[in-house]
């Protein structure tokens, strides 16, 4: 199949030779054929040598690379890529595990499918497009997904209203089922059940990327008073309860998130009085709280989504962690995270270091955390390592 062509400026092919999956607009010398948003194009060097093919889009990232081979991007291509993604999840033990039917099947660049996210909750796949190309290819992707996953996937929900690039010249799209409909919205993670709000919830309905970190927290919870800030649907809260916490308090500014947290706690621990939830701004809650907590989780939403917001984001992380350090009991544990892609590991550690120094407390790092294996990082795309976390012992 012949695709329209993008030609690079001299020397701008070097990142593609290192298999980085993005072509920036500033690297392009000319475009032949006037490709539309989301159309597949072939990319050539200034010497007219083929180097990659991918989805074309107006914006800073002009091409998201699908292949470094000259091949048709057809049904067979999608089947091959999804099969590789499935094989990895089988190797990780997250697919086919009776104690866990929640996992990420496709993680964008990490699975060589930039712009595509697919999370699985029991028999429902929630598909999210972050590029015009993946949006336009959603039906062929859904067909390939059915072929690869078989009866494992009985429902496919497409949720991209808020993730598609606003500059893309796309017709308005609505969230909705591409296959099936009205499935049960209860899934399981490490033997714990939870409701998934894929219709209106954040991301695909649940923060799948914290599965292993929640399991680690469970090991530290016994006999402790736990505070789960920015709790969303309460994932860390009910792991802490299963781990034997004395009490667990969950805080989120969203009343709907608090309702979901209470539902999930009741689903796993009906009648358990150890848990209490608060619909309140996190900073205000930290200002008024006492020193009764000896295990605190700080897992805020992304403080920065663009590099021009980085400085303010780092100040926000410092302020948030400083408040937690100030009121921590001696011998307390802090789980603190950043999910901002533009905040790298060293930036985040420096922000937490500053907060610790301001508090005057003795602080030691017990664990350095990241995303789980079903959120793989393409070694040629280090930007994909977005989740950073530290487990700290505070004297």
Report residues per predicted region.
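Mobile active-site "lid"/loop adjacent to the S-adenosyl-L-methionine
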Residues: 293-323
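Conserved SAM-binding motif I beta-strand of class I
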Residues: 247-252
């Amino acid at each position: 199949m012949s695709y329209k062509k993008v030609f690079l400026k001299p020397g701008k092919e070097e990142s593609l030779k290192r298999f980085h999956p993005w072509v920036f607009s500033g690297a392009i010398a000319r475009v032949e054929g006037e490709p539309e948003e989301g159309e597949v194009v072939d990319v050539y060097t200034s010497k007219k040598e083929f180097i990659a093919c991918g989805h074309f889009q107006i914006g800073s990232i002009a091409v998201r690379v699908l292949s470094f081979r000259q091949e048709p991007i057809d049904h067979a291509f999608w089947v091959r890529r999804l099969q590789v993604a499935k094989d990895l999840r089988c190797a990780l033990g997250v697919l086919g595990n009776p104690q866990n039917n929640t996992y990420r099947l496709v993680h964008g660049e990490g699975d060589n499918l930039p712009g595509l996210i697919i999370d699985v909750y029991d028999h429902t796949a929630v598909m999210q497009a972050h590029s015009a190309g993946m949006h336009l290819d959603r039906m062929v992707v859904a067909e390939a997904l059915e072929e690869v996953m078989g009866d494992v996937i009985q429902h496919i929900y497409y949720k991209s209203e808020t993730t598609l690039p606003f500059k893309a010249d796309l017709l308005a799209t609505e969230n909705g089922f591409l296959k099936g409909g009205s499935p049960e919205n209860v899934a399981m993670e490490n033997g714990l059940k939870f409701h998934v709000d894929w219709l209106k919830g954040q991301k695909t309905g649940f923060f799948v990327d914290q599965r292993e970190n929640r399991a680690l927290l469970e090991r530290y919870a016994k006999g402790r008073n736990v505070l789960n800030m920015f709790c969303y649907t309460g994932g860390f809260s009910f792991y802490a309860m299963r781990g034997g916490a004395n009490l667990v308090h969950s805080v989120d500014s969203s009343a709907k998130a608090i309702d979901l947290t209470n539902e999930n706690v009741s689903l796993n621990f009906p009648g358990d009085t150890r848990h209490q939830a608060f619909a309140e701004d996190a900073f205000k809650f930290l200002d008024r709280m006492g020193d009764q907590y000896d295990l605190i989780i700080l897992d805020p939403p992304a403080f920065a989504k663009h590099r021009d917001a980085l400085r303010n984001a780092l100040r926000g992380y410092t302020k948030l962690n400083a408040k937690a350090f100030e009121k921590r009991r001696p011998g307390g544990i802090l789980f603190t995270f950043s999910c901002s892609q533009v905040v790298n590991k060293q930036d985040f550690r420096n922000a937490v270091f500053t907060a610790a120094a301001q508090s005057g407390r003795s602080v030691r790092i017990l664990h350095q955390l990241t995303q789980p294996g079903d959120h793989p990082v393409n070694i040629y795309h280090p930007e994909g390592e977005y989740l950073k976390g530290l487990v700290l012992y505070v004297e």
